[in-house]
């Protein structure tokens, strides 16, 4: 039994596998050793396709949560969806050597890309995963061709106070009922996939490590980022003010496109995304990188 409550590893694996089963036929998985442990990655798409690395949100989002976009994105890309080290999923920290700093996260992702045989990649993330993706683009811009951020948290604006207050009971003493209640509050009338919701509940008590948190990226670093960025925001998000996030991003990022996804909340993404999200992402990722940047000649 975890200090955070009862945890049934078999139930979690079964719930995880049910969501993975929603991925396209032929999806495989690889385990990549890194200095921080073994990283589990779902892989789909043509072997010769341009690489795309997807990072999930925090909590029990897991790599599996990208199932609604996987088919569209894998038409043109070799998709690699990652389970974060130390978070619920199938990645395994190396003892106590999980990432503790932003620099550690950068080192972990560098090692993961090296292990996958990827030099330059398209990169995307949702929520906390978008925060990691943005930090990695700042850390190693030469490895990121194009970047999409799906309702990112703590990148351009803080959390709403009401969001933190509603999350507090679940964070202090997580139970399946509290997880369901919090997600129901944040997503409102958006119907949630029953298997995905069961995975969130099954993760209660998972022996996860404390996630890396920290300040927002430095404004001067964002202004210098020479990477095309697509920022998509949940119109009904209760996590933060989407208008504030978009406005702040436009003042800081030199190559950013912003758009609002109407009728969807933060925690409904990416699995309950509105129709057309996969195509919107695919169109952005199909475009060339910044003119003159390494790897863009002739595109």
Annotated model-derived regions:
Residues 71, 230-267:
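Conserved loop-alpha-helix segment in the C-terminal half of the alpha/beta-hydrolase fold
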Residues 131-138, 144-174:
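Flexible "cap/lid" loop of the alpha/beta hydrolase fold
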Residues 37-89:
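Conserved HGGG/HGGXW glycine-rich cap/lid loop of the alpha/beta-hydrolase fold
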Residues 1-31:
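An N-terminal hydrophobic leader/cap segment in hydrolases
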Residues 256-299:
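Catalytic active-site module of serine/aspartate enzymes centered on a nucleophile-bearing elbow/loop
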Residues 158-163, 172-226:
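Conserved alpha/beta-hydrolase catalytic His-Asp/Glu region
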Residues 80-124, 278:
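Active-site loop/oxyanion-hole signature of alpha/beta-hydrolase fold enzymes
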Residues 127:
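Catalytic nucleophile serine of serine hydrolases
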């Amino acid at each position: 039994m975890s200090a955070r409550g009862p945890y049934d590893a078999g139930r979690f694996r079964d719930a995880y596998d049910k969501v993975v089963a929603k991925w396209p036929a032929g999806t495989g998985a690889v385990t990549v050793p890194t200095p921080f442990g073994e990283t589990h990655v779902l892989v789909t798409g043509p072997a010769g396709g341009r690489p795309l690395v997807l990072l999930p949100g925090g909590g029990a989002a897991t790599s599996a949560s990208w199932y609604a976009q996987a088919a569209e994105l894998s038409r043109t890309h070799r998709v690699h969806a990652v389970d974060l080290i130390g978070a619920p999923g199938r990645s395994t920290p190396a003892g106590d050597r999980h990432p503790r700093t932003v620099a550690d996260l950068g080192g972990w992702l560098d090692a993961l890309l090296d292990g996958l045989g990827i030099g330059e990649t398209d990169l995307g993330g949702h929520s906390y995963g978008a925060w990691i993706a943005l930090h990695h683009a700042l850390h190693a811009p030469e490895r990121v061709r194009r970047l999409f951020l799906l309702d990112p948290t703590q990148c351009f604006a803080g959390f709403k106070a009401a969001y933190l207050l509603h999350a507090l009971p679940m964070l202090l003493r997580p139970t399946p009922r509290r997880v369901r209640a919090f997600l129901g509050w944040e997503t409102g009338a958006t119907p949630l996939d029953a298997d995905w919701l069961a995975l969130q509940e099954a993760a209660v008590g998972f022996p996860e490590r404390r996630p890396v948190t920290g300040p927002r990226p430095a404004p001067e670093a964002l202004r210098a980022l020479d990477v095309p960025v697509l920022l998509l925001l949940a119109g009904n998000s209760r996590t933060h003010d989407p208008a504030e996030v978009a406005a702040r991003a436009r003042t800081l990022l030199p190559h950013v496109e912003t758009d609002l996804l109407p009728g969807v909340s933060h925690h409904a993404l990416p699995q309950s995304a509105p129709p057309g999200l996969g195509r919107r992402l695919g169109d952005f990722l199909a475009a060339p990188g910044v003119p003159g940047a390494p790897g863009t000649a002739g595109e």
